From Swiss-Prot:
Compartmental location: Plastid, Chloroplast thylakoid membrane
Keywords for the protein's UniProt record, in alphabetical order: Chloroplast, Membrane, Phosphoprotein, Photosynthesis, Photosystem II, Plastid, Thylakoid, Transmembrane, Transmembrane helix
Gene that specifies this protein: psbH
Protein name: Photosystem II reaction center protein H
Transmembrane intervals: 41-61
Pfam families: PsbH (PF00737)
Membrane topology category: Single-pass membrane protein
Domain of life per record: Eukaryota
Residues where Phosphothreonine is found: T3
Keyword Membrane on entry: yes
Function: One of the components of the core complex of photosystem II (PSII), required for its stability and/or assembly. PSII is a light-driven water:plastoquinone oxidoreductase that uses light energy to abstract electrons from H(2)O, generating O(2) and a proton gradient subsequently used for ATP formation. It consists of a core antenna complex that captures photons, and an electron transfer chain that converts photonic excitation into a charge separation.
Family label: Belongs to the PsbH family.
């Protein structure tokens, strides 16, 4: 029994589209990690602002039955 070698390269090329040409550079960066902190400080600021938003919502609804008895000492 002979061993058959199969070529894995595709015989046909895919159809090109304008959207594919635009998105191609984004896909070429797949798997690469930028050195350093990157956007970590920006994410920290976003998390801080979200925490402030949640505290404001809690203050607005503090008189509700669900949160009755939650002490506010500000």
């Amino acid at each position: 029994m002979a061993t058959q070698i199969i070529d894995d390269t595709p015989k046909t090329k895919g159809k090109r589209s304008g959207l594919g040409d635009i998105l191609k550079p984004l896909n070429s960066e797949y798997g690469k990690v930028a050195p350093g902190w990157g956007t970590t400080p920006l994410m920290g600021v976003a998390m801080g602002l979200f925490a402030v938003f949640l505290v404001i919502i809690l203050e607005l609804y503090n008189s509700s039955v669900l949160l009755d008895g939650v002490p506010v000492s500000w």
